[in-house]
Structure formats: C-alpha cells, structure tokens
C-alpha cells in the first residue's frame, strides 16, 4: 500500500514543480557569476548559442549519475554554437566542487552559486535540474532530474539548425 502512495506523492510533486519552474520561451533570468577560473559569466554569454545549464553539486547522487552523460554531450557538440554551463549549488563547499571538476575533467565552464541566488532565480528546488536555452536567451525546456538524453540531443540539433 505504501508504494502507490509514494508514487502518487511523487507525481504530485512533479506536477507542482512544473508550475514553479520558469515557463518555456521566457527569457532566462539575469545572472552573473564567476567561474572557477575567475572569469565572469552572465546572460550576455547566452546570446548566439544553444546553452544547457546544469544545476548540481558533488554529493548529489543524481547529479553524479548524470554527469558522464553531460560530459559526453559537451564533448560531442564542441565546435558548434552550443555550450554547457555547470552551476554548482552551495550545498557542498566550493573546495569539493574544485576537487570534483579536477578529478573528472569537466570540459565545460563551472561556476559556484555561493548564495544560491541563480538557482533560486531559475526556480531550482530539486537536483539535478537543467535548463535548455535557445540562441536568443529564452528558456526552451527545464528538466528536473536526469533528462532523456536522446530526446535532448534531438532538441539541441533542431535549435542548432535554426
């Protein structure tokens, strides 16, 4: 009896999150963060590129589980008008983020959202959460949990073809 109740509760939470997160085709929230190398990253860097923003942290099991696929995606779209941005949430200390990035050789820009303000602006409450943004800086889709990467690749390819 507990299993159907748990599944129903999960479905309700998922439905509520769909209303909390940024609606599709709205401009991405304004943000400015410093990456792990000291460079400023902000909304201006979204223009002209399809962007996948991944909100994560190193001790998050789901985040760690999907990270090899995010790395593969970043490598697979190198040289195209596509970028991955990793925004580490302040659940873990910044030192853990640096260690994880170094250990796994993340091939994309990673920032530490020290105050959690960017995650809040994007409506993240569950991790991992990822956002696909078009070349105009508009949110195309928000993924709570690991996305279906095959479908994600199709969406990226469609946007790159525009």
Which ranges hold each PLM region?
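N-terminal targeting signals for export/organelle localization
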Residues: 1-34, 162
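A short beta-strand-turn-helix
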Residues: 31-51
